């Protein structure tokens, strides 16, 4: 029974698709005339009419209650009758698109030229990656290659890829002016007749690679025994490159291209290339896209900060990435010389592989790594330039409208304030602005979808009612792909997941590829019936594609099985891009069975949301408990601080009291100390006087002694003299006596 359903459903899809493909190509390729985009007044009239249209073409839109809508409806009566209006609104809401008219046949606008440059750089980068892998496989199996060097498919494929890379590098060097012209062009509505150059640019990177890779595959089939797993992986990579490049070629060769699709393709390609490179920062002009999405996304929907982004972008001057382009050309010249030295041999004779310089591959690989890094920088610059072009288109239309109105009224050219922008953008033009500015949201949703719903095809699993609860809880961390370590990170992740599931749910139910005008967090505050800007299901003139349904959805399945089947359903209802329908409006026509299918999916999503809400509440309770503990701890800390402050104050008071007492005692003892000092001074004076008196007395005594000594000496002298005189007298007397006796 299940197989029968699948067969019938597949037949139904085939019939629908056949009818779609057989529709009129003129109706299919006809888009919005460029006059609508260039003329802000007509564009704004479309927006106003759609805003007040009761039978709106925006699915899920609530009927307006604006009192000004009565006058607007009168103005738009005739316009609503025209089919051109419905087509214009359809294409405007799905993305800006150029009309396929005779005026621009054979010409491409700046955005398309930049897209072709991005595609060429992308293929150039993939060729470098394939060559690096081939070199690594050769280095890992050097000993085998030395033994079988003449007929080795690894060397053959490596030489062919080096020749392809050399031709690309030579082509870039010869067409430097074309690259510089694309990088330095200004954002204008004028078209440049460079289609032939762009086609040669694309064919240089794709067609030669395709033909040479086919020959490479034929050679590899002859030498399957020698070929290893690395070589097989290289072949798969090159084949994938061909497929992606062919898809890009078919998209580029269409008569008209969607500016929004252009922006989306490079964003998704760029996101895939740097999926594991956290150091790469994508910028919208000079504004980092990640910061805008994480911080300003919800405010941007209401118009806040919207024009700040535009003004910051318009503040830039000159060409972007000129230094990157110069480095790219210089490094490419070195790569070309290196490749020329290695690939001088004649590939027609396989015996020439004996002279293949294996030792030079290490140097070549190092140069390729540097070249790839410069190539990434150049590609980022080109993407930024393309986003600037789209921003300037929107801004120029608005400014020209304001200037024209001022000239009609005889007023000076106005300086437009942020409030004026916000008031008018809220009426509908914001849908288109966000379409151009935030196409990055699509890549984020695709990442979320890939993490929630795995893409692997697995068979149906048996129903296990006992394990219904465990898978639901375990499926929660896998929604984000990682399990945070801290509670705060877990809460933030769950909040983000719940918001994104609400956002994704609307995408699933309404089958709309445009970003949500009202995000989930704001829809709770505003009208719950406000939904994304999409198209009505009754538009039968637009083509679509389906993935084949693998198995049908069963409400009794286990939750893990349901999640996997939801992924299959999403793949089924995701339109493919090919050469016929990539630029047309993508709509989904659902049958009764499919509606039941989606309703069941919606119910399961609600269950997942409820479980996430329960987990969130538990975490909130847990964090509230932690907050209470933290509050108590903080209160204790505050009390301790208060006590410490009080004790410190008391100690200070005590110290002050003690110091005051000491000062008082010192002051009281001060006069006593003075008296004692005076007494001591007096005593010292008395001592000094006494010493002086004693000295004087001693001196006087000495003088007396000296005088006495002098007196004694004098007396002794006198005595001596007297004795001498007496002796003399005695001597004289005997003589006389002798004389007398003699007589």
From Swiss-Prot:
Post-translational modification: Not glycosylated.
The Sequence repeat ranges on this chain: 226-231, 232-237, 238-243, 244-249, 250-255, 256-261, 262-267, 268-273
Skewed-composition ranges (Low complexity): 512-521
Biased composition annotated in UniProt, kind: Polar residues: 211-224
Topology class, membrane: Peripheral membrane protein
Domain of life, per lineage: Eukaryota
Keyword annotations: Cell membrane, Coiled coil, Malaria, Membrane, Repeat, Secreted, Signal
Region of interest (Interaction with MSP1 and host SLC4A1/Band 3), ranges: 77-235, 364-528
GO cellular component entries: extracellular region; nucleus; plasma membrane
Spans annotated as 8 X 6 AA tandem repeats of [VT]-N-D-[ED]-[ED]-D: 226-273
Coiled coil: 644-732
Signal peptide location: 1-23
Region of interest (Disordered), ranges: 202-282, 459-487, 512-540, 666-743
Disulfide bond positions: none
Localization annotation: Cell membrane; Parasitophorous vacuole lumen; Secreted
Acidic residues bias locations: 226-274, 723-733
Skewed-composition ranges (Basic and acidic residues): 459-473, 672-722
Protein family per UniProt: Belongs to the plasmodium ABRA family.
Entry function: During the asexual blood stage, involved in the sialic acid-independent (SAID) merozoite invasion of host erythrocytes by binding to host SLC4A1/Band 3 protein on the surface of the host erythrocyte.
Subunit structure: Forms a complex composed of MSP1, MSP6, MSP7, MSP9 and MSP3; within the complex, MSP6 and MSP9 mediate the binding to the host erythrocyte. Interacts with MSP1 subunits p19 and p42; the interaction is direct. Interacts with host SLC4A1/Band 3 protein (via the 5ABC region). MSP1 subunits p19 or p42, and MSP9 form a co-ligand complex that interacts with host SLC4A1/Band 3 protein.
Descriptive protein name: Merozoite surface protein 9
Source species: Plasmodium falciparum (isolate Camp / Malaysia)
Lineage, uppermost ranks: Eukaryota, Sar, Alveolata, Apicomplexa, Aconoidasida
Name of encoding gene: MSP9
